[in-house]
Amino acid sequence: ADLANLVNEAAILSVRRGKKTIAEPELKESIEKVILGPERKSKVISAKEKKIIAYHEGGHSLISAMLPNADPVQKVSIISRGQAGGYTLSAPTEDKRLHSKNYFLDELAVLMGGHVSEKMFTNDVTTGPSNDLERATRMARAMVTRYGMSNLGPRTFGKKEEMVFLGREISEEKDYSEHTAEAIDSEVSRLIREAEATAEKTLKEKKDILEKLVKELLEKETIEKEDFNKLVGIEIAQKNEEKIERKIKGEEKLK
């Protein structure tokens, strides 16, 4: 159903723009609309809130760019979509069937990035990160109770009952003591605190880049992948690596 919705949205956009076929821009836009909701450009946002949202999304996107295991940023925007004040769109460069502990740790830091950025650079915290905190808590709990990625060791906690035909969890049977429940909560909190510390360290080290991102977001409202990579220095790093690789290959040929 989701795939059909994506194609339908892309087809509608293509027709509106006088195109006979669905092209990549329409497909990307339809993905954003279906996943995040329609743009709400008409929503009036104060200058103060706009700045907070810019720091929030700047925090998410910059941490995603700086941590090696996080998904690359495709787009960052402070235009409202659905219930969100702004959004950072990230996606893996290839299909993944397996996810590592390091991936989850970096993604936790990305999720905490909006909250940390608000706290560090606006001297306040808002209700904006509520969904991020919920997702971070779910991810950390899954690491502890489902994937054995914590100090409690390689085991699972809790038996889940599922509706087989719908693939949906309906309940969870508790197969551990209250003492273990406290240990699980403690591990979840530890993972989130460490992710918060990683986010804070990254933003402190890259403060100048964050300020550039915020300035660009306030001026343009949306930054696409190519411009984002230039702002944070990813493109330069990639080009330098390519130059070194070509140089090494050239030297090898001379030998």
Language model region names:
Residues 1-25, 32-40, 61-73, 143-150, ...:
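AAA+ ATPase "lid" subdomain C-terminal helix
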Residues 16, 47, 125:
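Generic anion/oxyanion-binding catalytic loop in active/binding sites
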Residues 51-55, 61-255:
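Soluble catalytic regions of large protease machineries
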Residues 1-3, 45-46, 116-121:
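Noncatalytic linker/hinge segments flanking ATPase motor cores
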Residues 41-52:
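Short pre-active-site segment immediately N-terminal to the catalytic Zn-binding motif
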Residues 12-29, 88-97, 101-103:
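Short secondary-structure boundary segments
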Residues 28-33, 82-84:
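Short, conserved phosphate-binding/catalytic loop or strand-edge motifs used
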